[in-house]
Amino acid sequence: MATVQEKAAALNLSALHSPAHRPPGFSVAQKPFGATYVWSSIINTLQTQVEVKKRRHRLKRHNDCFVGSEAVDVIFSHLIQNKYFGDVDIPRAKVVRVCQALMDYKVFEAVPTKVFGKDKKPTFEDSSCSLYRFTTIPNQDSQSGRVNKLYSPARYADALFKSSDIKSASLEDLWENLSLKPANSPHVNISATLSPQVINEVWQEETIGRLLQLVDLPLLDSLLKQQEAVPKVPQPKRQSTIVNSSNYLDRGILKAYSDSQEDEWLSAAIDCLEYLPDQMVVEISRSFPEQPDRTDLVKELLFDAIGRYYSSREPLLNHLSDVHNGIAELLVNGKTEIALEATQLLLKLLDFQNREEFRRLLYFMAVAANPSEFKLQKESDNRMIVKRIFSKAIVDNKNLSKGKTDLLVLFLMDHQKDVFKIPGTLHKIVSVKLMAIQNGRDPNRDAGYIYCQRIEQRDYSNNTEKTTKDELLNLLKTIDEDSKLSAKEKKKLLGQFYKCHPDIFIEHFGD
């Protein structure tokens, strides 16, 4: 009997990753060990689509890293778009478990891994603050100075199967335990590649469409203008321009100082300096206190400079002012979850550079607002000072009252780890539309089922009757069991109920 390794090799996984090598009508369900293919496809997608770059983690800079929430977004979109499991809903929590499995099998690792200890199992975090790095394998020539190479998806699968402490069918068993069984339908096809322009336009259109589902807007002008705008392609990092400037040395000195200090406050503040003009950075560098251990003076200098810059520039969320009102109204009414999703959609409409700048600023605000951090003013609370200084840097909406503005800013600070995630509902909407485009169908025809589903008149009548009856029974039970009502009041209410709904009354109390 062929081993799992031989069967995995027979699938020729590396070739299958290219749409050009997939035969018409290809289905995961038609392949033996379909879960093996799915795992390898997930690894390939994660390696090729997640943004890997130099990032800061635990007060140090690390090369070639990606954040946990973006990994979840990439895999989530890939699973839904490729219809591996038919039309079944895949909760984000399941995708987090998939990421945990990939980390357990050393596809990627947390940064830095030593903080977990030798015997403690690392836990994957769906967060924009958790960093991960793809694992490397020692090359035979590594001792001679050659750089280690990443596993290819096929070699990952091969290495996973060959691990001595993993059972031969462990990947299949793990996949089954996730309750995500591959669909048996022969119509599940791997999607073809769409152009980035089409994908960006679909994301833009569906983000706005979903936002309209959540926020009641009096006018649509701002959203329509946003929809007409062409989604911007991420621009080159500003650092490439700085490298050629005479002020690069000052920025380098500040970053080196930050790296030498194990202080989250300083790390977050100096990350924000990348968006300040060169002249301000030079002033900060030249104004540093002579005693390097006086971090209190350094923090005061940095906070004043960042606050001064953002108090004089255009607000980062100056677009879609009507949406600000809608989100604030949701917060006033206690609808926090809906407000969070609406905020995520609003930030999704930001261009790449503004989104990254806002993420850094919001992170710095959250750290600086912590009462256990550096005291910004002796007689005032850190949280209120941060809100007062940076509110106009975020939102400056004349149609939004001061109370609602403060509520919105504090909400953003409190949820800064979550507001940059992409909602799962939007993932599914976009995936459904992209699949329709790929299959040559009308992309707008089937999108409505996400929000509502057409049913027969008879089913509607039956559901209405059943729901009404259940609610009347609940009302009757509430009256009967309410200990706060006097006997006279209860008798009166029960009499009124019997007069209007005798059949419900008899069903509950009997003859």
Curated annotation (Swiss-Prot):
User: What InterPro entries does the record point to?
Assistant: DEP_dom, WH-like_DNA-bd_sf, WH_DNA-bd_sf
Every DEP domain range: 46-136
Query: What domain of life does the native source organism fall in?
Result: Eukaryota
Q: Which residues cross the membrane?
A: none
Any single biological process term in GO: intracellular signal transduction
What CDD domains does the record point to? Answer: DEP_DEPDC4, RhoGAP_BRCC3-like
Which residues, by range, are in coiled-coil regions? none
What's the family?
Belongs to the DEPDC7 family.
According to UniProt, the name of this protein is: DEP domain-containing protein 7
Q: Which organism is it from?
A: Pongo abelii (Sumatran orangutan)
